[in-house]
Amino acid sequence: MEKQQFVVIAYDGTDADALNRRMNAREAHLENIRTMKAEGSFIEGGAILNDNGQMIGSVVFVSFTSRQELDTWLAADPYVTGNVWQKIEVKPFRCVKL
């Protein structure tokens, strides 16, 4: 089955403990992303920063066989289970081929 590409835009909470939750879940989240990269599901991504350079969210480009598969990944990601990402937008996406 052909994979579909998606962009995930996720915003962290804005409470005083938000950055601590992110940092506590970060290594597990990155390990998950490394596995996805090896499996071909992770395209690119990184942190959204505020004007002071503090991480306040993430943008992730991924490819899955279905939206359901993407939702399964999201539900298990440490940034979701660790209550880091508070608002998540998912949109279909297509990488330009240069």
What annotation goes with each model-predicted range?
Residues 1-98:
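Conserved, structured core segments of small domains
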